[in-house]
Amino acid sequence: MYKRNFFKIYVLLWFITGCKISYKTYEFEKAPEIQRPDYSKNESWAVIPGKIPNLISDFYDNKNEMKDADVFFIYPTLIDGKDLKAWNSDIWDRHIRNDVLNRPVKYQASAWIESGNLYVPYYRQAHLRVFNKKFEADGKKALDIAYKDLRDAFIYFIENHNNGRPFIIASHSQGTLHAKRLISEFVDGKKIQKKLIAAYLVGWKVDPNEFNYLKPMSSPDEIGGFVAWNTYKINKYPRKNTYEEYFRGGVTSNPITWDKSIETDKSLHKGLLYRNLKIFPKSLNIKLIDGMVWSTVPNLPGKLFFSTIKDYHFVDINLFWVDIKENAKLRVKQWFLKNNY
């Protein structure tokens, strides 16, 4: 949790609740071309075996040792400035690259680093404004560019890095929007589906019947399906039209017990990851409602800040960081047991 970015990320709520923000931009066709990533080169990956950033190396031992499973992680929206005219991020810009490493890699992707060899591709993600209906037409084109990069990255990952290992797909926010499309095209009902340990599709609505063959998982050691959730402060809702479109009816997994429990006491909470990289266990109670995980205000030094807001989208993963880490390791272990490895 990185305090300087709390309000930047929280701006997503403004879009989906209809608040007006004035953005400077230009027609998509007039956007300057951004150099495409080349996933055969390590410079196009934020994280790849042999290129583990020091800022996450403390999360596990033997960082140079190859694991028996892989993790493909897609990070959330990071470019959101109202004065930024670009439709897609320039992944060659050092500030953007540093943001990827110091925000989602450090506080989100790190939850899966003990589960498998971590792969995080840089991609020309779409600017936050694409989720505003005012920019819908050009926004779709920007999202298509982002997906094209991730599609190329996943193909290269499977054909050149994976070597037939089982894998996890994990994502957040815009990353989940793309992950759903990626799974539909390459995994669901395809030959490699049997290699999917689990998909953690966080921070974006995922319908129960999103895929033809992959189904929501409802036990902590289940494999071959997906989990999903969106987090809000307890007893709080977004605006009605927002709730109906972005939340209601979406799969809502329990990110503490990973079963069908509707309410979970803080005594079972394994721990959240705070901005100083300290773990705070037994910090929150949760309750599942239609399309959302309701969380109590976390018991930590930033409690006052959390009490002032209702949308916990920006900490969908951080709040359950240890719970995710331990569950992912369990599912990896279970995959190998069930497949007689």
What role is predicted for each listed range?
Residues K24-K30, P76-R165, P301-N318, V322, ...:
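Active-site catalytic motif of lipid deacylating hydrolases and related acyltransferases
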Residues S171, G175:
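Gly/Ala-rich beta-loop-alpha elbow adjacent to hydrolase catalytic centers
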Residues K20-I21, R151-N163, E185-L304, T308-F320, ...:
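Surface cap/lid and interfacial helix-loop subdomains adjacent to catalytic sites
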Residues H178-L182:
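Hydrolases whose catalytic domains are alpha/beta-hydrolase-1, hotdog thioesterase
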Residues D70-I74, Y119-Y122, I168, A198-L201, ...:
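Structural recognition of the beta-strand scaffold that forms the well-ordered cores
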Residues M1-Y23:
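Bacterial Sec-dependent N-terminal signal peptides
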Residues C19-V105:
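Flexible, membrane-associating and regulatory peripheral segments of lipid-active enzymes
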Residues K3-R4, D61-N64, A109-W112, G189-K191, ...:
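A general structural signal for short secondary-structure junctions and capping/turn motifs
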